[in-house]
């Protein structure tokens, strides 16, 4: 914990010293109004759930109905801070609907993505960043939740896919069907290549018991590891999970997939994680959040 706090202090000092002048040149001001901070495993957890609305008579689907449903079904986890509870999909009368509010329905469902962060870690991070930037608007979010949502913005035409988000301690697996998250699973990341593939295969096997698996896999990992992990998945006998001799397509997500979608300094080296954070923040701002 002491080392983590010191690392955060060094990061904050560096951003103030080097980032403020860059910001001044780019937008004419070096001040910060809000901070988005991504926190990864083992300090975060992400889950997805679906809630349903059914009435005997047709009803108008409203933001108030959604807010009431989210609040009434939300859960508290001891020693965990809920940092995100987003409605990421809406189904009216059996059809996925992008602009559902104000429309009439007989039945509806909402898909909710919820993120928790270890309370002590979140409070320490928020307190330190508020002190550095003199703003109360510090928003922590679970890293894999952010990246899952950013991938949807980066590849809007891939409506069915698996997303593998690999960090040093774990691999999160998200299943997207018809542009909706329907399942999230967690596999331990192991140093041994065979163990990592085995753990991922085990989680995919469990998901396949409930849903058909899409043929596209997006692989998110550090640039130094992504090529090796892509080869491991390519060499694994995954076809049996798809009941096919043809293996699924494994797409290693690279900075080049995202860089055209966000504005960045010409002198900066593309960093995939920062690009995905920027894309996420940009999309949320466009949605008025």
Show where each model-derived region lies.
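A short, acidic, amphipathic alpha-helical segment used as a generic capping/interface helix at domain edges
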Residues: 196-210
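Conserved structured catalytic cores and adjacent interaction surfaces
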Residues: 158-159, 181, 215-217, 266-268
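Glycine-rich phosphate-binding loops at beta-strand->alpha-helix junctions
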Residues: 213-241
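Hydrophobic beta-strand segments of well-ordered beta-sheets in folded domains
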Residues: 33-37, 211-220, 248-251
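Nucleotide/phosphate-binding catalytic cleft detector across ATP-hydrolyzing
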Residues: 1-34, 39-161, 210, 235-240, ...
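Short glycine-rich, Thr/Ser-proximal phosphate-binding strand/loop in the N-terminal lobe
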Residues: 1-2, 51-60, 179-196
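A short acidic Gly-Thr/Ser loop motif
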Residues: 40-42, 155-156, 163-172, 176-179, ...
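Nucleotide-binding motor/catalytic cores of P-loop/tubulin-like NTPases across gene-expression machines
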Residues: 181, 225, 236-275
